[in-house]
């Protein structure tokens, strides 16, 4: 979900309990649009992160350590002047909007009492962090300067009077009176889109969840939703302050820890995406090209359906050769295949026998085309399957795995090796410890590793696992030739997790002995065929997978 007003409401409550009456000890700006305050509160030190990033804007406590620039910016120098040693008096969310105001008190150089408000506006590309004088509402400094030419509604420059962002007529879902709420719930269309316009601070996911629950007892359902306790929940791709329906996620003790984990993982994913962008683009282009090629080949194969018709016409002309006239462009003969008369087109320049041979040649040509096209289609389908497997691996790869996937694409001829580019050393296969505490399970994280694991490392009697009919890793239970059902389930869950079905609630996984696997001649790396497998059904669990991994 997005960092919406609903999420912000919960995190402000968390920050208020931790930081109010604390003192600001240090102020740093590790990145251009981010600010970190070190605060001493309740005999503990906390790091408060405020981010005006256009995509990752947020406010949270963080355990992450940052490297600070050697030379502080003007913004930081002004903040240190007003905030160093300041007491945090309050932390408030403006209505249910994505604006937080932190009021602090301090003493200036001559000992006079002063108050200031540190404001963070989390509004996408318009996100900002401002320090405002409490009494005069004058802006003391702002992390992003916005002049009149950029925004005619309000100027965000030092010395300007602070004007809040324009408000809408939408209502605060946390403070709305029962009478007004009852009227809305009875008279308005309660779709997610309409709920977003009626109430402040609802992101798409929050609005979708609210629409889902507003079916019966709407007033109490609404109140219960907005009054529920914070129970942070992290999924593979999102986060929420409370668990949403159909959202199997990992619980967290607090929202700040959840955000630390989410943004650390997201930063890793973004770095991987950046590093892998060339490979992803190349694979997507090759997939598109091969899918287009497959459609064309299938159309051409469809056009060969009349091959049998040519053979039959050749046979009929041969059988009734004496009835076929010269110098005619057609003849009608009895068709003993259908017991109906048939008209056969002729070439007047040819003899009856030559016309028959012409039909046989056309039949033979189409017959050869069928075999040729069938082989081509199988080859193209295999290429598409291979590229889909690479695409799956790329989407799940870490930074250290990108180079090995590139090497694989070089070896399979999809990209060229750069000048002076070294051949990548093969990374060791990942090992996981099964629930019995002793069995090792190997996982191939790309097709070269899959090939090595299945056809070089694994013993014939060992069990092999793969997600059914979708791209994924090869998984082998090593050494244990009679594994328990629990160990088999562990291996199946690994195969499900490292597959295209990672985010599914239920994944089918094939299990078979290595000796029953077949590597087709000329097949792409990691491609196998098999029959006689058993199929398990499991649910991928990221937390369990992480706990199984051997360091």
UniProtKB/Swiss-Prot annotation:
Gene Ontology molecular functions: ribosomal large subunit binding; rRNA binding; tRNA binding
KO phenotype (gene knockout): About 50% reduction of binding to immobilized human fibronectin. Greatly reduced mortality in mice (tested with encapsulated strain D39).
Keywords: Cytoplasm, Protein biosynthesis, RNA-binding, rRNA-binding, tRNA-binding
GO biological process: rescue of stalled ribosome
Main location, first listed in the record: other
Cellular location(s): Cell surface; Cytoplasm
CC terms in the record's Gene Ontology section: cell surface; cytoplasm; RQC complex
Lineage top rank: taxon: Bacteria
Family recorded in the similarity comment: Belongs to the NEMF family.
Function according to Swiss-Prot or TrEMBL: Key component of the ribosome quality control system (RQC), a ribosome-associated complex that mediates the extraction of incompletely synthesized nascent chains from stalled ribosomes and their subsequent degradation. RqcH recruits Ala-charged tRNA, and with RqcP directs the elongation of stalled nascent chains on 50S ribosomal subunits, leading to non-templated C-terminal alanine extensions (Ala tail). The Ala tail promotes nascent chain degradation. May add between 1 and at least 8 Ala residues. Binds to stalled 50S ribosomal subunits. Recombinant protein binds to immobilized human fibronectin; binding is saturable and competed by heparin. Recombinant protein inhibits binding of whole cells to fibronectin.
Subunit structure comment from the entry: Associates with stalled 50S ribosomal subunits, binds to RqcP. Interacts with human fibronectin.
Full protein name: Rqc2 homolog RqcH
Gene source species: Streptococcus pneumoniae (strain ATCC BAA-255 / R6)
């Amino acid at each position: 979900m997005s960092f919406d007003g609903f999420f912000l409401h919960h995190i402000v409550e968390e920050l208020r309990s931790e930081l109010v009456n604390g003192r600001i000890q240090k102020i740093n700006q590790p990145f251009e649009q981010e600010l970190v305050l070190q605060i001493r509160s309740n005999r503990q030190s906390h790091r408060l992160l405020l981010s005006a990033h256009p995509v990752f804007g947020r406010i949270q406590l963080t355990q992450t350590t940052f490297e600070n620039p050697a030379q502080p910016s003007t913004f930081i120098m002004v903040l240190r002047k007003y905030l160093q040693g300041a007491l945090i008096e309050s932390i408030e969310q403006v209505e249910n909007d994505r604006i937080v105001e932190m009021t602090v008190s301090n003493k200036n150089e001559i000992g006079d009492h002063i108050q200031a408000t540190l404001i963070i506006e989390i509004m996408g590309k318009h996100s900002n962090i401002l320090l405002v004088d409490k009494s005069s509402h004058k802006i003391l400094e702002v992390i992003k300067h916005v002049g009149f030419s950029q925004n005619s509604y309000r100027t965000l420059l030092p010395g300007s009077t602070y004007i809040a962002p324009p408000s809408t007529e939408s209502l605060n879902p946390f403070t709305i009176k029962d009478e007004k709420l009852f009227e809305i719930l009875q008279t308005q269309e309660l779709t997610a889109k309409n709920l977003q316009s009626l109430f402040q601070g609802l992101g798409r996911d929050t609005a979708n969840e609210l629409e889902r629950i507003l079916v019966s007892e709407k007033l109490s359902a609404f109140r219960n939703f907005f009054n529920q306790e914070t129970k942070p929940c992290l999924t593979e791709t999102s986060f929420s302050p409370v668990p949403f329906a159909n959202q199997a996620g990992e619980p967290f003790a607090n929202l700040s820890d959840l955000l630390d984990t989410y943004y650390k993982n997201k930063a890793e994913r973004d770095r991987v995406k950046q590093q892998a962008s060339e490979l992803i683009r190349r694979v997507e282009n090759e997939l598109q090209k091969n899918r287009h090629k497959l459609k064309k080949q299938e159309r051409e194969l469809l056009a060969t359906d009349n091959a049998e018709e040519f053979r039959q016409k050749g046979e009929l002309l041969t059988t009734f050769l004496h009835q076929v006239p010269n110098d005619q462009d057609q003849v009608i003969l009895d068709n003993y295949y259908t017991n109906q008369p048939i008209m056969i087109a002729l070439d007047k320049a040819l003899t009856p026998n030559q016309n028959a041979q012409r039909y046989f040649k056309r039949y033979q040509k189409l017959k050869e085309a069928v075999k040729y096209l069938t082989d081509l289609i199988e080859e193209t389908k295999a290429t598409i399957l291979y590229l889909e497997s690479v695409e799956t691996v790329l989407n799940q790869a870490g930074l250290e795995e990108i180079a090995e996937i590139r090497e694989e694409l070089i070896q399979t001829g999809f990209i060229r090796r750069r000048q002076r580019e070294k051949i990548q050393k093969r990374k060791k296969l990942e090992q996981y410890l099964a629930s019995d505490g002793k069995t090792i399970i190997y996982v191939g994280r790309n097709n070269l590793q899959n090939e090595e694991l299945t056809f070089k490392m694994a013993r014939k009697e060992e069990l092999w696992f793969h997600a059914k009919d979708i791209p994924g890793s090869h998984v082998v239970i090593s050494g244990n030739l009679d594994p328990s059902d629990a160990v088999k389930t562990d291996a199946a869950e690994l195969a499900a997790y490292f597959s295209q079905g990672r985010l599914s609630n239920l994944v089918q996984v094939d299990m078979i002995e290595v000796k029953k696997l077949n590597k087709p001649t000329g097949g792409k790396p990691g491609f196998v065929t098999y029959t006689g497998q058993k199929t398990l059904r499991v649910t991928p669990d990221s937390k369990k997978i992480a706990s199984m991994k051997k360091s």
